[in-house]
Amino acid sequence: MPYLYRVAYDGALFHGFTGHSNSVEAALRRVFGHLLGRGSRTDPGVSAVGNAVLAPSRLPLGYINSRLPRGVWTWAVAEVGEGFNPRRARRRRYLYVAPHWGEDVEAMREVAELFKGTHDFSSFIQFRGERGTPPVTTVDEVGVEVAGRLVYLYFVGKGFRNKQIRKMAWAILAAGRGVVSRRYVEELLERPRPGAVPSAPAEGLILLDIEYDVKFDVDRGELRKAYVYFLEKYRRLEALAAAYRAAGERLLFYDDL
């Protein structure tokens, strides 16, 4: 009987989810022997708290995690039927986080609204040689929130194509900075031009959740280990950011002498 496992990981420590010896999938394969499928293939640098993998056997989550490298955890498991495909999810939820440097919030929200619904997203996809597949996808929700010095972009849909979220994030942020107009983005959706839009940095993207019609058994102890890791890393990076800011301000002080 196959089992579906929830997986969280720090994307900064791995060369993507798959396709490399230092990938998250490679680390999981070394524990399970082999895997039967995955929920989402994330790029190098992209983190996740709710990705999923399908494995042929049930192992204790603590046992799995004790054999995984630092920065990746399984924290829940569900028994599923034969033939279950983890790619066929109800919804996927992503969050993109970026610094807020005064971007126009309303301009960002106007562009975010354009992405809702069903469109040909060729301008916002990096093709992997699958041009025979229609690049039409449906985006259910796109949200823009600003809190303090950060911009939070939320994306919800059944599925997204390669680099699609990072390219949409770039367009939203660029609109807030006045780099592109709402009309420019509309034209890219109406008359697609592959390669017209760059990707926002991978490090700002997090796969929050993949929704399935299954009930997971959550190991709160293993879940907390992942939580503590991310909290401690946040605190370290916050202190590092403050140190860099202080260094920059000191350099300006010398410039005024």
Swiss-Prot record:
This protein's source sits in the domain of life called Archaea
**Gene Ontology BP term (one):** tRNA pseudouridine synthesis
Upper lineage? Archaea, Thermoproteota, Thermoprotei, Thermoproteales, Thermoproteaceae
Its top-level enzyme class, in one word, is isomerase
In this chain, substrate is annotated as bound at: 94
From the Swiss-Prot or TrEMBL record, give the protein name. tRNA pseudouridine synthase A
- Which species is listed as the source? Pyrobaculum calidifontis (strain DSM 21063 / JCM 11548 / VA1)
Record keywords: Isomerase, tRNA processing
According to its UniProt record, which residues of this chain constitute the active site? 43 (nucleophile)
Annotated catalysed reactions: uridine(38/39/40) in tRNA = pseudouridine(38/39/40) in tRNA
Q: Mind telling me which InterPro entries this protein's record contains?
A: PsdUridine_synth_cat_dom_sf, PsdUridine_synth_TruA, PsdUridine_synth_TruA_a/b_dom, PsdUridine_synth_TruA_C, TruA/RsuA/RluB/E/F_N
